[in-house]
Design a protein with these regions (language model features):
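Alpha-helical transmembrane-bundle signature of multi-pass membrane transport and export proteins
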Residues: 1-411
Length: 411
């Protein structure tokens, strides 16, 4: 019954705004293609090189652009047309994946993945910076929840389909399918009215002054500072888990590839449930409580998985932890959207996302050494510690944030 109510409310969000339907459809279609291609890229590079160094280069090429954009190019998300940025990002990724299907050298694959990463580095903050302009204040939590649910479903479904497609037909077919997904996505995005994604034209005072204004708004806003500090702590925990998960499955639990896949699936299912439930939880409880509790659930899930006797117990812990992860991510989006005015919201998102990716990259580098030194169970326990610290910091900071910022009155 409760699920029917939640789904009914989510359908109401889709019915409330035609422009949001276009954005949702774009997110769903392009996300499915993207995650399908993630598997293809990794397999393609490894099969051509049999080198972990090249695979690492591919992963760096994927997230490094987001770091650079966050620290150096954020003003463009506010200054330029957000609609044109979104459509342009899809066109660039369309071209990149067509060329990937024709690439023959590993360096070409990594270079084109970097180009696609640059486009994605602009597209993600644009979507969430522009979202508050497509729906009303009351609907915004459910709209965020719906977009995050779509993203989580594409992660689970896309990676599964990617494995099937690559195994059956090779990486090139996956690249062509992803290119087609960006073509369909761009077709939907061009139908959003040009001015809908931002309140108006933002005057520039020079790139470096514009950039400094973005840093300043994050520093001065309690809500934005909460997301920056809290989620950077959580990202350390996420990095430790991501790197050591395969070791936990294969070495600690002795469950092989099947166990690793089972843990991955549990993560996806838990995250989809968390994203779906987030808006309903926020309607019943305060942002401060939901945010801190969600991160606390993440920490509990990591610790419980570390202590689990086998993979069959661990998957339930992992699923529960990812319910918390997805709920907290919805809260992150809302805190930034409510804490930053539209003319600097793009800079706020790019800076926070860039910082998060930078910490994630550093954490992944440390995790590789740590898992070899102390083992996967201890690494997951350490992850739980960082995440629990994030919950405490988030709660302490939000307690002092004006209620009008956390939960503005519906007009």
């Amino acid at each position: 019954m409760w699920l029917q109510v939640i789904l009914g409310r989510q359908r109401a969000v889709l019915r409330s705004s035609l422009s949001f339907r276009f954005l949702f459809g774009s997110t769903l279609i392009s996300g499915l293609g993207t995650w399908l291609a993630v598997i293809a890229l990794s397999v393609d590079v490894f099969d051509r090189t049999h080198s972990g160094v090249w695979v690492s280069a591919l992963l760096i090429a994927d997230f490094l652009p987001a770091v650079a954009i966050g620290f150096l190019l954020g003003p463009l998300v506010d200054r330029l047309s957000r609609k044109r940025l979104l459509v342009g990002a899809d066109v660039v990724r369309l071209a990149a994946f067509i060329l990937l299907a024709l690439a023959v050298k590993p360096w070409q694959i990594v270079a084109l993945a970097f180009v696609a990463g640059v486009a994605t580095g602009f597209a993600r903050p644009v979507v969430y910076a522009g979202l508050p302009n497509l729906v009303d204040t009351e609907t915004l939590p459910r709209a965020n929840s719906l977009l995050r649910t779509a993203e989580q479903l594409t992660v689970t479904t896309g990676t599964l389909l990617g494995g099937i497609v690559v195994a059956a037909a090779g990486p090139d077919v996956a690249y062509w399918l992803n290119a087609a997904s960006f073509l369909l996505s761009a077709t939907l995005l061009v139908q959003i009215p040009g001015g809908m994604l931002q309140e108006g034209r933002v005057a520039s005072h020079g790139h470096w002054r514009d950039l400094a204004e973005g840093f300043d708004v994050v520093r001065r806003s309690r809500a934005l500072l909460t997301v920056l500090l809290t989620w950077n702590l959580v990202q350390i925990g996420i990095a430790l888990v991501n790197v050591s998960e395969v070791v936990l499955a294969k070495v600690s639990f002795k469950s092989g590839d099947f166990g690793f896949g089972l843990m991955w699936a549990a993560s996806g299912v838990g995250a989809a449930i968390g994203a779906l439930l987030a808006a309903s939880l926020l309607a019943r409880r305060s942002m401060t409580l939901v945010y801190a509790a969600a991160i606390g659930v993440m920490a509990f899930g990591d610790l419980a998985a570390a202590l689990s006797p086998d993979v069959w117990v661990a998957v339930w812990c992992i699923a529960l932890g990812n319910v918390g992860t997805a709920t907290a991510i919805v809260c992150n989006s809302l805190l930034v959207q409510r804490g930053a005015p539209d003319h600097v919201r793009g800079r706020a998102f790019t800076l926070i996302m860039g910082s998060n990716f930078a910490v994630l990259g550093i954490g992944m580098g440390i995790a590789g050494v740590l898992v070899n030194a102390v083992g996967a169970r201890w690494v997951w326990g350490i992850s739980a510690g960082f995440t629990a610290l994030g919950a405490i910091v988030g709660y302490a900071l939000l307690r002092r944030t004006p209620q009008a910022v956390l939960e503005p009155a519906v007009t």
